[in-house]
UniProtKB/Swiss-Prot annotation:
Residues bound to substrate: N113, T163, K167, R285, H317, S369
Coiled-coil parts of chain: none
Annotated catalytic residues: K165 (proton acceptor), H284 (proton acceptor)
Protein name (Swiss-Prot/TrEMBL): Ribulose bisphosphate carboxylase large chain
PANTHER family the UniProt entry points to: RIBULOSE BISPHOSPHATE CARBOXYLASE (PTHR42704), RIBULOSE BISPHOSPHATE CARBOXYLASE LARGE CHAIN (PTHR42704:SF15)
A Pfam family that the UniProt record links to this protein: RuBisCO_large
Feature type site, description Transition state stabilizer: K324
Binding-site residues, Mg(2+): K191, D193, E194
Enzyme kind, highest EC tier: lyase
N6,N6,N6-trimethyllysine PTM positions: K4
Catalytic activity: 2 (2R)-3-phosphoglycerate + 2 H(+) = D-ribulose 1,5-bisphosphate + CO2 + H2O; D-ribulose 1,5-bisphosphate + O2 = 2-phosphoglycolate + (2R)-3-phosphoglycerate + 2 H(+)
Organism name: Cassia fistula (Golden shower tree)
SUPFAM superfamilies given in the database record: RuBisCo, C-terminal domain, RuBisCO, large subunit, small (N-terminal) domain
Length: 465
């Protein structure tokens, strides 16, 4: 048997439309935009090849292994409705191509060099189906939704948070004071901003100490368990773990990590530490829009969300939906379900390309944060349900009477919405009315309603799909 050198079309080896996918395969849905003149089958096969065993030419060492066992296969291609020259290419990867328990390795293959490939004008990873056999090699979230509720002793409602602002420039003592005021007023959590690490104006150890003091003082006053997301993100893994260890020594309930800028290796390391030491882990997605904002290139956030659930985190930021388009609402709810639920059916109308079974991997609480205030509370309660964290930064600290009254206003609005929902009222239709009624017996809420009333609150009844 001679070795035949030379370049041959990818589709001869890597396009296999009659392939039956296995339960152990990792399946990927790519949005492919081929260069002019490149047929979609060749483009799809090129993606499968370059993200698995292929290279640009036939190599002598191909004969030393079994390509059929290890190659990625493009097994289906469909045009994207309403787009010219865009296709969804489905690729199946054999499980043996990936290291166990490593999101880093999975992404290095699937979204590695192939994204710079010349035969493609653009490439976007829309969704991944992670097989049960691979999921079982990951620890996943340190604790998950149920354990978190038990630790905090808070049930039957969303949790309330607030990012401390101004995010950069406060001294540690003033920062701690802002934390104390918010928690005393009725919030469950306050949060370090994602870019608060350890800067000259506030070193991490000072911040940790003052925030812990604020936490314990607010806890003693209110009789509720409180938390502050202490950001452990650092320049090295060792420094990150050092910060997490100090947080544990202070006895606080939760730390935080920026998982995309910090990287999946660091994130998984921290998640393991958190499970071993009883710390909850809040995840911020800084940098996600660099990766997921372009419609035709990069990676959809639902893939980053699935990767986080594998790598480990108990909370993750997931957009707010409010004020966005109806379609985006469905898509956001799609990946919110992927974060929280055990089993999610394929549903293309919500952007879910594959049925995903998470077996016993704990769920992640989605965090709604960014530009929300008390008038949004009915919509947020309806959209996200109980298993979520609602974070009002400016919506707390921007209250005309200060942080604590701002926190009171949010807590009153939330409790009113939860009670109304439990009584069977329709939050979508009666939201404004519910908030107005509640503000009659809460001067703090009335003041908040007055400040933000100009910011329109339009929440049509949800389209049921």
């Amino acid at each position: 048997v001679g070795f035949k050198a030379g370049v041959k079309d990818y589709k001869l080896t890597y396009y296999t439309p009659d392939y039956e996918t296995k339960d152990t395969d990792i399946l990927a849905a790519f949005r492919v935009t081929p260069q002019p003149g490149v047929p979609p089958e060749e483009a799809g096969a090129a993606v499968a090849a370059e993200s698995s065993t292929g290279t640009w030419t036939t190599v002598w060492t191909d004969g030393l292994t079994s390509l059929d066992r290890y190659k990625g296969r493009c097994y289906h291609i469909e045009p994207v409705a309403g787009e010219e020259n865009q296709y969804i290419a489905y690729v199946a990867y054999p499980l043996d191509l990936f290291e166990e328990g490593s999101v880093t390795n999975m992404f290095t293959s699937i979204v590695g060099n192939v994204f710079g490939f010349k035969a493609l004008r653009a490439l976007r990873l829309e969704d991944l189906r992670i097989p049960i056999s691979y999921i079982k090699t990951f620890q996943g979230p340190p604790h998950g939704i149920q354990v978190e509720r038990d630790k905090l002793n808070k049930y039957g409602r969303p949790l309330l948070g607030c990012t401390i602002k101004p995010k950069l420039g406060l001294s540690a003592k003033n920062y701690g004071r802002a934390v104390y005021e918010c928690l005393r007023g009725g919030l469950d959590f306050t949060k370090d901003d994602e870019n608060v690490n350890s800067q000259p104006f506030m070193r991490w150890r000072d911040r940790f100490c003052f925030c812990a003091e604020a936490l314990y003082k607010a806890q003693a006053e209110t009789g509720e368990i409180k938390g502050h997301y202490l950001n452990a993100t650092a320049g090295t893994c060792e420094e990150m773990i050092k910060r997490a260890v100090f947080a544990r020594e202070l006895g606080v309930p939760i730390v935080m990590h920026d998982y995309l800028t910090g990287g999946f290796t660091a994130n998984t390391t921290l998640a393991h530490y958190c499970r071993d030491n009883g710390l909850l882990l809040h995840i911020h997605r800084a940098m996600h829009a660099v990766i997921d904002r372009q419609k035709n290139h990069g990676m959809h956030f639902r893939v980053l969300a699935k990767a986080l659930r594998l790598s480990g985190g108990d909370h993750i930021h997931a957009g707010t939906v409010v004020g966005k388009l109806e379609g985006e609402r469905e898509i956001t709810l799609g990946f919110v379900d992927l974060l929280r639920d055990d089993f999610i059916e394929k549903d293309r109308s919500r952007g879910i390309y594959f049925t995903q079974d998470w077996v016993s991997l704990p769920g992640v609480l989605p965090v709604a944060s960014g530009g929300i205030h008390v008038w949004h509370m009915p919509a947020l309660t309806e959209i996200f349900g109980d298993d979520s964290v609602l974070q009002f930064g400016g919506g707390t600290l921007g209250h005309p009477w200060g942080n604590a009254p701002g926190a009171v206003a949010n807590r009153v609005a939330l409790e009113a919405c939860v009670q109304a929902r439990n009584e069977g009222r329709d939050l979508a239709r009666e939201g404004n009315e519910i908030i107005r009624e509640a503000s009659k017996w809460s001067p703090e809420l009335a003041a908040a309603c007055e400040v933000w009333k100009e910011i329109k609150f339009e929440f049509p009844a949800m389209d049921t799909l």
